[in-house]
Amino acid sequence: MNAMLETPELPAVFDGVKLAAVAAVLYVIVRCLNLKSPTAPPDLYFQDSGLSRFLLKSCPLLTKEYIPPLIWGKSGHIQTALYGKMGRVRSPHPYGHRKFITMSDGATSTFDLFEPLAEHCVGDDITMVICPGIANHSEKQYIRTFVDYAQKNGYRCAVLNHLGALPNIELTSPRMFTYGCTWEFGAMVNYIKRTYPQTQLVVVGFSLGGNIVCKYLGETQANQEKVLCCVSVCQGYSALRAQETFMQWDQCRRFYNFLMADNMKKIILSHRQALFGDHVKKPQSLEDTDLSRLYTATSLMQIDDNVMRKFHGYNSLKEYYEEESCMRYLHRIYVPLMLVNAADDPLVHESLLTIPKSLSEKRENVMFVLPLHGGHLGFFEGSVLFPEPLTWMDKLVVEYANAICQWERNKSQCSDTEQMEAELE
């Protein structure tokens, strides 16, 4: 009798379990998708100056909310994964010409050149010289999307193809791209300066490319000639400082490290005959390379130590990271410099962001832009689920470049007026 009376209570128990399970799933979804995070304008770090005030007035994206797609856009991991897997949605196919440059060591550097599709807003000849992220090139979707947008805003674009990154271009010397080598980027810039003597340059670097362009500008004052400004997006500033954080499981960085290392292994091994073949006249530093250690490598640091540092004869990984990081060159850049990172970038630990923050507090030419969301090179925009083809990052870089061009035009006009007044006196 008692058993019969108790049976109706069982469904209520099961309903409670179901409710708890649903609540747990919803909690995990809210936490993973970071749905409670607010949308806000990016945090800005800069010195109060005429330039910074002009930029705040001329670049609405610096003071407006960045609004990512509602459902998944506040997750740095999803933004990063979509960038890594898709690049961009409905990416255009800009038409360009591939250029080849023979380097002094026999390497063949390539870059793609895209002509502007409209007149620039200030009417001048401006060329964007662009350095992509690790193992990337002009055919990547995020590069194509950015180039197409820049062309439509009146910019000529030159995009470096990292040495060894294009699958259909063979290496012609026992060397490929490294973390901080500026040789190929410098050769591309010099080609543009020779071919278009009237042009002015806007320098743009994405991720690893941000390290390369900042290091290039800081290496010598001559590299900043004809440069209007520089933009670096999602770089880590110091490989030496990043080394330890990249081995941590916090924010899944160790997993991302493994994925990038696996991709690097595939690229290196696809060129193993050109790099390590018996017939190749390779530098002494590469003679002792143990390919078995490359096969078993699970991190970028292991690959850098076993292979990459040896392309330039560094004696240790520490020396390689110290010399090839842009951190020691940033204070030598005198042109306007915008550094952009996302607070939820799972690849760049927050401790690394003290570098651009500190620099922006000391230098009037530097502005550090830190939105809450965007992941690593994601910065997708959209209403609910589906992202737009053009990202916040694409629009910000062009908007900043336009503002700097106008700033320089205004300065030039003021100088001309002052000169005329002086002559009249």
Curated annotation (Swiss-Prot):
Organism domain of life: Eukaryota
Description of activity control: Acylglycerol lipase activity is activated upon binding to progesterone.
Family annotation (PANTHER family): ABHYDROLASE DOMAIN-CONTAINING PROTEIN, MONOACYLGLYCEROL LIPASE ABHD2
Cytoplasmic side: 1-9
Residues that carry a glycan: 136, 410
UniProt xrefs under PROSITE patterns: UPF0017 (PS01133)
Enzyme class, broadest EC rank: hydrolase
InterPro entries in the cross-refs: AB_hydrolase_1, AB_hydrolase_4_CS, AB_hydrolase_4_sf, AB_hydrolase_fold, ABHD4
Recorded topology in the membrane: Single-pass type II membrane protein
Keyword terms of this UniProt record: Cell membrane, Cytoplasmic vesicle, Glycoprotein, Hydrolase, Lipid degradation, Lipid metabolism, Membrane, Serine esterase, Signal-anchor, Transmembrane, Transmembrane helix
Extracellular side: 31-425
UniProt protein name: Monoacylglycerol lipase ABHD2
E.C. code: 3.1.1.23, 3.1.1.6, 3.1.1.79
Family classification: Belongs to the AB hydrolase superfamily. AB hydrolase 4 family.
Catalytic activity reported: Hydrolyzes glycerol monoesters of long-chain fatty acids; an acetyl ester + H2O = an aliphatic alcohol + acetate + H(+); a triacylglycerol + H2O = a diacylglycerol + a fatty acid + H(+); 2-(5Z,8Z,11Z,14Z-eicosatetraenoyl)-glycerol + H2O = glycerol + (5Z,8Z,11Z,14Z)-eicosatetraenoate + H(+)
Major place of residence: membrane
Tissues with expression: Widely expressed with higher expression in testis. Expressed by vascular smooth muscle cells, non vascular smooth muscle cells and heart.
AB hydrolase-1 domain boundaries: 128-382
Gene for this chain: Abhd2
Summary of the knockout phenotype: Neointimal hyperplasia. In lungs, decreased level of phosphatidylcholine in the bronchoalveolar lavage is observed. Mice develop spontaneous gradual progression of emphysema.
Organism, scientific name: Mus musculus
GO cellular component: acrosomal membrane; acrosomal vesicle; sperm flagellum; sperm plasma membrane
Subcellular locations according to the entry: Cell membrane; Cytoplasmic vesicle, Secretory vesicle, Acrosome membrane
BP-aspect Gene Ontology terms: acrosome reaction; acylglycerol catabolic process; negative regulation of smooth muscle cell migration; response to progesterone; response to wounding; smooth muscle cell migration; sperm capacitation; steroid hormone receptor signaling pathway
Disulfide bond among keywords: no
Function text: Progesterone-dependent acylglycerol lipase that catalyzes hydrolysis of endocannabinoid arachidonoylglycerol (AG) from cell membrane. Acts as a progesterone receptor: progesterone-binding activates the acylglycerol lipase activity, mediating degradation of 1-arachidonoylglycerol (1AG) and 2-arachidonoylglycerol (2AG) to glycerol and arachidonic acid (AA). Also displays an ester hydrolase activity against acetyl ester, butanoate ester and hexadecanoate ester.
Residues annotated as transmembrane: 10-30
